[in-house]
């Protein structure tokens, strides 16, 4: 839609999370299950590519597209993980996106949600009902690492209209 393209065009960084499965990869491309190569780009990937080209033409810079691999498993050597990594790398070259590791599958993230917390919030025994564990601290570090890997542009803009992006028709 027009609004979707406009929102994408105004973004400095586009983050697309995918889980470790070929089902999620379908949002980027159709993959041949027999030889692990992509057959075609998805409508979403084509839209993002078009918007990035338009942004390059109108502003001389493009959108930083980052695919974030989420719910990472400790089974890095599983057949599925190896195949998926190969295809994502191939797609990153073709579609010019960066790949960043996201967050692991951690029970602690499910623990935070019902009490309205994120891994970056302050938490202690009073808030959690128990002393924070190494898992809580590891989750926080994982989120901090993800944010660092995104390499987001400086958001400390001056007040007023300086630095604010205006959509180009």
Which role does the model predict for each range below?
Residues 1-101:
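Conserved catalytic-core segment of NTP-binding enzymes
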């Amino acid at each position: 839609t027009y609004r979707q393209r406009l929102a994408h065009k105004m973004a400095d960084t586009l983050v697309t999370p995918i889980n470790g499965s070929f089902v999620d990869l379908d949002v980027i491309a159709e993959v041949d299950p027999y030889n692990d190569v992509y057959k075609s780009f998805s409508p979403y990937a084509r839209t993002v590519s078009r918007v990035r080209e338009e942004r390059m033409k109108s502003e001389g810079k493009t959108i930083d597209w980052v695919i974030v691999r989420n719910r990472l498993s400790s089974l890095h050597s599983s057949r599925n993980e190896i195949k998926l990594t190969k295809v994502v790398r191939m797609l990153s070259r073709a579609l010019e996106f960066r790949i960043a590791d996201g967050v692991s599958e951690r029970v602690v993230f499910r623990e935070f949600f019902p009490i309205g917390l994120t891994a970056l919030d302050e938490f202690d025994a009073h808030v959690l009902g128990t002393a924070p564990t190494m898992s809580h601290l590891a989750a926080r570090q994982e989120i901090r690492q993800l944010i660092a890997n995104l390499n987001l542009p400086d958001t400390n803009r001056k007040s007023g209209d300086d630095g604010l992006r205006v959509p180009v028709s």
